[in-house]
Amino acid sequence: MTASQPESDSNALNKYSSKITQPKSQGASQAMLYATGMSSEDMNKPQVGIGSMWYEGNSCNMHLLDLAADVKAGVTDAGMVGMRFNTIGVSDGISMGTDGMSFSLQSRDLIADSIETIMGAQWYDALITLPGCDKNMPGCLMAMGRLNRPSIMVYGGTIKPGSYRDEKLDIVSAFQCYGQFIAGQISEEERSEIVRRSCPGAGACGGMYTANTMATAIEALGMALPYSASIPAEHPEKKEECKRAGLAILELLKKDIKPRDIMTRGAFEDAMVTLMALGGSTNAVLHLIAMARSVDVPLTIEDFQSVSDRTPFLADLKPSGKFVQEDLHSVGGTPAVMKYLLEKGMIKGEHMTVTGKTLAENLADLPGLKTGQKIVSTVEEPIKKSGHIRILKGSLATEGAVAKITGKEGLQFSGPARVYDNEELMLAALEQKQIQKGDVVVIRYEGPKGGPGMPEMLTPTSAIMGAGLGSDVAMLTDGRFSGGSHGFIVGHITPEAQVGGPIALIEDGDTITIDAETNSLDLEVDAAELEARRSKWTAPPLKATRGTLYKYIKCVKSASEGCVTDE
């Protein structure tokens, strides 16, 4: 059974909701809808599900209930019925460095499942979602792809930067000040002030971290209105965008433009180029693969390497640079960047978008980057001539790994392994000064099944950066790295340790070599020794044996397959 194929007039704007609003046999359905305040006239109107990831406990999401009200007002003004509903969210910033991080990636698929569930059960004709934090965005798009009903994503927007002693702060400042403190570089009073001032209000983490990366990719993909990714959360333009979404979704209904008409192979290509140029998070690899699979578009980790090879890294945005998303909006925003990429022939812009026009048609009517801006370099003088995301393979990652290398760290690293079976052990070693320059830190059993949930390693990378070792230490994991992570880092190593991947066989002192020019990741141990180690290896017990994480362990695919759970 599929809820996406009702028996009704295929040309009607209410072809889904009419399944319950029109038949006399569905009187009970209609009685309950009348109870919500709908009128007899409303029963003939299209119904739009408005899915918000609002919850109070996270700055990224705490304002979404108000934005959902603005979206509903726009839907009502457009002559339709808006029905708000909520789904879950997990704050990566709050759960980072704790066992709570195991629930983060899993929340992406729960969001997709819950949106698909309510849209299918309630028979809404179209969907507008309001995500805030990292996993919210791909969760929304995966649901849209599965449902294939007219859909728009309205990003909750980015946070304003904080400030302390005339320096801009963001969430990564709050992470890194711990490493600075244990290294004796700042006092406890300074550390406390940085923490208090890093997040001054509502909105997602301010740099080109995962939330802004995914919002940017989704705008380039065509599933959000122009400027959605760069308008700050508390800017008046964000409320205006919410209200415009009503008329936009009406046009999609009239033209019967659906996610699978927009999310084409060409759209994913343009999205990948855009995020590479802006220095987006490695998490985009995982999420775009999952989104593509939801619409049956083939996309692999090798495709990211192909795009990276031909796309220069242009944007001086945090975490590797000094600007934040609000700064980018002030010089033209996401559309201005894409307009420049289109002019340079780096994206094609041929795919349909939620405006009912192609991306190129949208950009033709919008201004370019402001003259004299310092955030986005030219293609002729880039920060790096190729992309920062590298797909590595070798004896340590036979099925692939994802590195984030901007060029500031160098392109090769070789050194002795320092192996830790969880991030807590690594942090303890750092505090005890056991990690030295030249080391390759390995944090394993943090993959999709082993973590479980492939937790992010922002706390360890931030601690290393704060301790002044960022240029002298490499870090590898079968877990993920936050969009806020920077340094010489390699994640998404597959096969993961829990299933017996080579990362499980590393011992302290083994030489590991990372080469971002040859895209290789190798464990310098001979095959006979590795085979001897494998014969003694046994998988550790699963960290979850009941409940939602156990279900996730049983269902999740590998990182190279997007960690999807519905195949």
Curated annotation (Swiss-Prot):
GO terms for biological process: branched-chain amino acid biosynthetic process; isoleucine biosynthetic process; L-valine biosynthetic process. InterPro entries: DHAD_IlvD/Edd (IPR050165), Dihydro-acid_dehy_C (IPR042096), DihydroxyA_deHydtase (IPR004404), DiOHA_6PGluconate_deHydtase_CS (IPR020558), ILV_EDD_C (IPR056740), ILV_EDD_N (IPR000581), IlvD/EDD_N (IPR037237). Mg(2+) binds at D92, D134, K135, E456. Its cofactor is [2Fe-2S] cluster; Mg(2+). It catalyses: (2R)-2,3-dihydroxy-3-methylbutanoate = 3-methyl-2-oxobutanoate + H2O; (2R,3R)-2,3-dihydroxy-3-methylpentanoate = (S)-3-methyl-2-oxopentanoate + H2O. SUPFAM superfamilies: IlvD/EDD N-terminal domain-like, LeuD/IlvD-like. The active site is at S482 (proton acceptor). It is an enzyme of class 4 (lyase). Homodimer. This is Dihydroxy-acid dehydratase.
